[in-house]
C-alpha cells in the first residue's frame, strides 16, 4: 500500500516537472519565444545599422561633390534686419521692404510694382575704390545756380564743413545750422564711405519721404512730408530707422549724385541729370500721365503729387521733379545756405541741378529723401 502511494506521488511530481519544462520551452516567456525575439531584434539592429551606414555614405558623397549654387536675386547684397527682399536686380534696382508680406512679391523681376505695404528702399551698388571701373560713390557737378546778395554758388562738399573758414549767419544758427551740426554731417559722410567700402553700396528711399499723420514713411501714394525747414528734415531722417544693422540719414550730396549716375547708367534715362524731357516727371512745364496714359497733371501747371505717381527709373521715383529735396549739402555763412536738389513742381530744374535757399524756408514744395547705410 505504501509503495503504491509513493508511486503515485512520484508520477505526480514527474508530471508537474514535465509541465514546467514544457512551459519553459513553449510558453509565452519560453526559450523558443525568447530566441525568436532575439533573432528579430538582431535583424532589426542589422537593418538599422545598414540604413544609417547608407545615410552616412550619402552625406559623405554629397559633401565631397561640388554643389550647384542656387541663383540668388540679391547677388550678395546684405538685407538689414527687419527688411525683406521684394524684387529687382543689382542693375534694375533691388527693392527691400520692412513688411514681411512684401517678401519676394516681385522675386527675380526687374521692375517692382507699387502694391506694397512697407517702407521701401533701393540698393545702389557702388565703390569707394577709385581704381575700380565700378560706379564711384562720389559727388558729381552738373548745373549750379549762382545768385544771392553775395553771388554765391549753390555747391559745397560736406567734408569741408569743419574747415576753419566756415562761418554761420544769425539766420543759420536760429534755424539749427551750426558748428555741431556740421561736425555731425562730416561724421555722417565718413560713415557712409566706410559702409560703402565694406558692403559695396547703400540704400536710398524709393520715394520722397511721405507723411502719415506725423509719421515719416517711405511708401507709395503718400502726401510728401513738406512745409518744414532743413533742420526739421535732417532730424526726421535720422529717426526713420532704429536698427542694429542700418542707420538712416538725410540724403547726402554723395548719395544723391551716385544715385543719379546709377539711374543714367542702368535705365533709359541717359541724360536724367541734365534734362527733363521724356521722363514723365512732375515739373512745371511737363504733363504727367498715369500708367493708363491718363493725364493727371497738365503741362504748365504747378501741382504737388503724392509719392510714386510718376514714372520710376531703376525702381526709384521722383529723383527728378515733384518735391525739391533737402540734402546734407550746406553752404553756411552765405545768403542762401541750404542746397536743394531734384527740381520741383514749381520749377524745371533737372535731377542733377543744384540751387539754394535760406535756412529758414519751409515751403510746401520742399521735401526730403532718406537713405540707409549698413553698419
Language-model segments: residues:
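Short, glycine/small-hydrophobic-rich surface segments
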Residues: 54-69, 273-287
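GGW-centered surface loops in extracellular recognition modules
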Residues: 67-133, 248
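Short, small-residue-biased leader/transition segments that mark boundaries at the very start
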Residues: 1-2
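Membrane-proximal N-terminal amphipathic helix
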Residues: 30-63
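C-terminal juxtamembrane segment of a hydrophobic transmembrane alpha-helix
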Residues: 14-36
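Disulfide-stabilized, aromatic/cysteine-rich ligand-recognition loop
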Residues: 227-235, 241, 247, 251, ...
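Short aromatic-cysteine micro-motif
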Residues: 117, 147-318
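Acidic glycine-/aspartate-rich tracts in secreted/extracellular proteins
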Residues: 127-131, 208-214, 328-333, 345, ...
Amino acid at each position: 500500500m505504501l509503495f503504491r502511494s509513493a508511486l503515485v506521488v512520484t508520477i505526480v511530481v514527474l508530471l508537474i516537472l514535465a509541465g514546467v519544462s514544457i512551459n519553459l520551452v513553449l510558453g509565452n516567456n519560453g526559450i523558443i519565444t525568447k530566441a525568436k525575439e532575439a533573432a528579430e531584434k538582431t535583424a532589426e539592429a542589422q537593418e538599422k545599422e545598414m540604413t544609417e551606414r547608407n545615410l552616412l555614405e550619402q552625406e559623405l558623397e554629397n559633401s565631397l561633390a561640388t554643389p550647384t549654387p542656387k541663383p540668388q536675386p540679391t547677388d550678395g547684397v546684405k538685407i538689414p534686419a527687419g527688411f525683406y527682399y521684394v524684387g529687382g536686380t543689382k542693375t534694375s534696382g533691388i527693392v527691400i521692404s520692412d513688411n514681411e508680406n512684401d517678401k519676394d512679391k516681385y522675386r527675380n523681376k526687374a521692375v517692382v510694382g507699387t502694391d506694397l505695404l512697407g517702407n521701401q528702399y533701393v540698393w545702389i551698388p557702388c565703390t569707394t575704390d577709385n581704381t575700380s571701373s565700378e560706379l564711384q560713390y562720389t559727388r558729381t557737378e552738373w548745373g549750379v545756380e549762382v545768385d544771392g546778395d553775395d553771388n554765391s554758388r549753390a555747391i559745397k562738399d560736406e567734408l569741408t564743413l569743419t574747415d576753419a573758414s566756415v562761418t554761420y549767419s544769425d539766420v543759420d544758427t536760429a534755424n539749427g545750422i551750426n558748428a555741431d551740426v556740421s561736425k555731425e554731417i562730416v561724421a555722417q559722410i565718413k560713415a557712409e564711405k566706410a559702409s560703402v567700402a565694406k558692403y559695396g553700396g547703400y540704400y536710398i528711399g524709393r520715394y520722397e519721404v511721405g507723411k502719415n499723420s506725423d509719421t515719416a514713411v517711405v511708401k507709395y501714394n503718400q502726401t510728401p512730408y513738406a512745409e518744414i525747414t532743413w533742420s526739421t528734415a535732417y532730424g526726421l531722417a535720422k529717426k526713420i530707422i532704429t536698427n542694429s544693422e542700418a542707420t538712416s540719414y538725410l540724403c547726402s550730396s554723395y548719395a544723391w549724385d551716385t544715385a543719379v549716375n546709377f539711374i543714367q547708367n542702368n535705365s533709359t534715362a541717359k541724360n536724367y541729370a541734365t534734362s527733363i524731357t521724356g521722363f514723365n516727371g512732375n515739373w512745371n512745364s511737363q504733363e504727367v500721365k498715369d500708367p493708363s496714359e491718363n493725364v493727371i497733371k497738365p503741362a504748365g501747371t504747378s501741382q504737388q503729387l503724392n509719392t510714386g505717381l510718376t514714372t520710376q527709373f531703376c525702381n526709384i521715383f521722383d529723383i527728378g521733379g515733384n518735391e525739391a529735396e533737402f540734402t546734407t549739402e550746406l553752404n553756411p555763412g552765405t545768403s542762401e545756405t541750404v542746397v536743394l536738389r531734384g527740381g520741383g513742381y514749381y520749377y524745371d530744374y533737372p535731377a542733377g541741378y543744384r540751387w539754394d535757399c535760406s535756412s529758414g524756408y519751409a515751403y510746401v514744395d520742399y521735401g526730403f529723401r532718406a537713405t540707409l547705410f549698413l553698419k
